[in-house]
Amino acid sequence: MDIRCVNWFENKGETKYIYLKAINRESNVIFIRFNYYYHYVYDASKELEYKPNECIDLGPFKIINIDEKLSTDIRYVEPRNYYTSELVLVKDLKRNREKQYLQEYLDITWFYLLNNITPDGCYKIDIEHLTPIKKDCYHCDDVSKVFIQEIPIFEVKFTYLLFDIECQFDKKFPSVFVNPISHISCWIIDKVTEYKFTLINTDILPDKEPSILHHKDFSPKDRITYCTEIVMLLIMKKILEHRFDFVITFNGNNFDIRYISGRLEILEKSFIYFSLPDATETVKLKIFERFVTGGTFTNKTYHINNNNGVMFFDLYAFIQKTERLDSYKLDSISKNIFNCNVAIKEIDDTILTLEATVKDNSKDKLSIFSRVLETGNYITIGDNNVSKIVYKDINQDSFIIKVISNRDYEIGSVHNISFGKDDVDLKDMYKNYNLEIALDMERYCIHDACLCKYIWDYYRVPSKINAASSTYLLPQSLALEYRASTLIKGPLLKLLLEERVIYTRKITKVRYPYIGGKVFLPSQKTFENNVMIFDYNSLYPNVCIYGNLSPEKLVCILLNSNKLESEINMRTIKSKYPYPEYVCVSCESRLSDYYSEIIVYDRREKGIIPKLLEMFIGKRKEYKNLLKTASTTIESTLYDSLQYIYKIIANSVYGLMGFSNSTLYSYSSAKTCTTIGRNMITYLDSIMNGAVWENDKLILADFPRNIFSGETMFNKELEVPNMNESFKFRSVYGDTDSIFSEISTKDIEKTAKIAKHLEHIINTKILHANFKIEFEAIYTQLILQSKKKYTTIKYLANYKPGDKPIRVNKGTSETRRDVALFHKHMIQRYKDMLMKLLMESKGQQEITRLILQSLETDMISEFTHNREFEKYLLSRKHHNNYKSATHSNFELVKRYNLENTEKIEIGERYYYIYICDISLPWQKKLCNILSYEVIADSKFYLPKDKRIFYEIYFKRIASEVVNLLTDKTQCMLFFSRLFGTKPVFSSD
């Protein structure tokens, strides 16, 4: 039999088993049970106090102590301790045995490695060597006899349950103790057919009789079933206990499933149960919480404790982890991914006829949108015009819809439409609840259930799950849950076993700070000439590979008391550990009593971390090449997911070296990596800053050299193609792995040509070994506000005459989600004005005067005439990591949640606005501004006796504008006159 592995799971009882859920070519499910063993690695000579189930000789391993020892005298540098020992792997049924080596690795990873199993692989199995237990469930005692060979991946049909519920409520958020469920909409996708249906509660519809009286009378073929809430809950109990491959919800683990389970217990004293495929264990549905701390907030995820092989997948938690959005409500996510362009074909009073074709959209975008349109009831035109759909005509490459809208539009105009929030107020609907409203709500509910599948398909979640499972050697149900420090353990254990190396530590890990990447100060604020951008390719991974930065390759760490001692010690240590066999790097000291430290790495044999990185980079290249030749959709989606997973994990290695809780923790390796990275970007800056292209010669600012040996590689003067013109180069900024080089021309075509020549010269004459740079782009009209904040017009590296540039805002207020739309528009306008005045060669004093004059006029006009509040909305993320338990932000949300049904959850962004009494005149002095904050939800409107507190917004805008200008005197006078204070000027 040919099978595809789709999930692995364990039972909850004391006698542990591993279960494989597999699907054969006929899309039938089989379960295979394996004995669960705990794995312990010992020296072969060690006498055990217990009799293990099995001992496996691993052979000789190099045991390396990777504790970092500090030396203060070069004469007494201690060599790294290691020895070779014969090891044995013990498999035992009991946990918590004494462990000697490799204790931090997961038992399931050992299972995969020892049996040479890929978690998501396809295999030819010999069913004769399996022992039948129950129908479609077998026990396996000998994996090698059952799993005959791995075969190419084949497609199987998964089964799905997607559902959404609506609960009756009045003012507050629904309570499981008080509020009944009014609707449950489901989409069941089976091997052969699909069912879309809704259960409607007749207990709250007195004029409607139930269509069934018992849950056994239910048929999923009926589009709508009317029944009592108890019957509805018993139907869902049976459905949820069924062994689907996936149960997909949006925040269902926290709300929908919890609510159904709670109502079932309250009304019927019944519970949802899950059973193992071998029927040896049954568990009651429980929801457990897992906390993930990151940044400024703690994120909580919810998980179902099932044991039946079903993957309960919460799209809400998945998207929170993978996307950076203003809001993680279903309508916001839908709006973000399901959108297209339409042309207005006809306007008949309030009815708009909209047409979408391949002329204004890609085929993929149109196809995805059309699919969602099948169940959609409302679309959003532009940012906020929610319009009801009254007619649909969906074709293969186009669609026509008619919507109701009171807004003014022009025939022929093109607009972006999206699936956002349906324009329904559930609270009002329940207030006037009847059969007609119940049916209207049903359309809303079934659409939300279907949206889960559309989002699932859009993100290609199964492909991502399988790619992660295969790469990290984890069960599919866990592959997307863990953090990088756990995910790396599978590939690392595999490599350690292959290389026959084991790391040990005797000293407790100590966390020290270290300096990160080099960020140059901007040389000035604005640039009229073009700026070329050059990036190092995978700088940190390549630094680790070249320097052989791996904990077992660390030779010594020498502390220096002062600069003179540092220089003397460096000369001595380089003679003792010569390049290229070794690399000696001077870094900042980890101890405050010392001036610096010299770290030495042995490059003679490749270390574990460089091998790990080369494997990840090589695998990514392999899958990118396979992606180009993929012949089926399943292959292309899998290879794309795999290359992406390998990119992510390769980039995470450097971070894990500096993370004390990681298996890969190596403080010296992380610090040396960033030090070499800073040296590489500084070296490139020294070569390019002041270089000149004179006709057919390039005169560099310094001699190209090997930064590790100091050896000069080429002359400063290099031959280049004759441009019959001279160009000067000046470094104006740099950040970690990229350098911004200004060229003395405004001609895009010439700049692109020269930059490509420079890329080749830098890679062949200036850099060496595996270090390479790439010409990324040309920036024109660059405004460098400060470190990591700039605005520019960007031309791509492969520029051809006629290509249109794009505007780029990086780190500026235009890209920040906590900045008001009005602020963004104003800053963009004044940056455009600044560049225009610079191109006109106006003087700095004149530029400052004109901009401040215009800014004051605009602010006075806005203060006098505006009543639109939407463009003044700000947003922030709700979290509970404030130092004070009564922080004003937290209290603001707390008060809002007490009064509103749509609660703001931890980790979610919300909008707020500053408003004050309309009678309040212009306020020069702003005090206690937090007291003027009001949360602005979808129903918010500006009260007649209030005005926007413009002064708060204007002061922030003015602060940013004056930091773009050079005449500080004019700026201070302007600020004092309008706001009664001096502006704060940026120091970088």
Curated annotation (Swiss-Prot):
Q: What is its EC number?
A: 2.7.7.7
What reaction gets catalysed by this protein? DNA(n) + a 2'-deoxyribonucleoside 5'-triphosphate = DNA(n+1) + diphosphate
The residues forming the signal peptide are none
Q: Is Transferase among this UniProt entry's keywords?
A: yes
Q: Which cysteines are joined by disulfide bonds?
A: none
Which InterPro entries does this UniProt record tie to the protein? Answer: DNA-dir_DNA_pol_B (IPR006172), DNA-dir_DNA_pol_B_CS (IPR017964), DNA-dir_DNA_pol_B_exonuc (IPR006133), DNA-dir_DNA_pol_B_multi_dom (IPR006134), DNA-dir_DNA_pol_B_vir_insert (IPR013617), DNA/RNA_pol_sf (IPR043502), DNA_pol_palm_dom_sf (IPR023211), DNA_pol_type-B (IPR050240)
Question: Which residues span the membrane?
Answer: none
Per UniProt, which keywords does this protein have?
Answer: DNA replication, DNA-binding, DNA-directed DNA polymerase, Nucleotidyltransferase, Transferase, Viral DNA replication
**Which GO molecular function entries does the Swiss-Prot or TrEMBL record give?**
DNA binding; DNA-directed DNA polymerase activity; nucleotide binding
Q: Which SUPFAM superfamilies does the entry mention?
A: DNA/RNA polymerases, Ribonuclease H-like
Q: Among the record's GO biological process terms, what is one?
A: viral DNA genome replication
The record's Pfam families line, in alphabetical order, gives: DNA_pol_B, DNA_pol_B_3, DNA_pol_B_exo1, DNAP_B_exo_N
Q: What does the subunit comment say?
A: Interacts with A20. Component of the Uracil-DNA glycosylase(UDG)-A20-polymerase complex; A20 and UDG form a heterodimeric processivity factor that associates with E9 to form the processive polymerase holoenzyme.
Read off the PANTHER family from this record.
Answer: DNA POLYMERASE CATALYTIC SUBUNIT (PTHR10322), DNA POLYMERASE DELTA CATALYTIC SUBUNIT (PTHR10322:SF23)
What role is this protein assigned?
Answer: Catalyzes DNA synthesis. Acquires processivity by associating with a heterodimeric processivity factor comprised of the viral A20 and D4 proteins, thereby forming the DNA polymerase holoenzyme. Displays 3'- to 5' exonuclease activity. Might participate in viral DNA recombination. Does not perform translesion synthesis across an abasic site.
Family the UniProt entry places it in:
Belongs to the DNA polymerase type-B family.
Name of the protein in its database record:
DNA polymerase
Q: Which organism is it from?
A: Fowlpox virus (strain NVSL) (FPV)
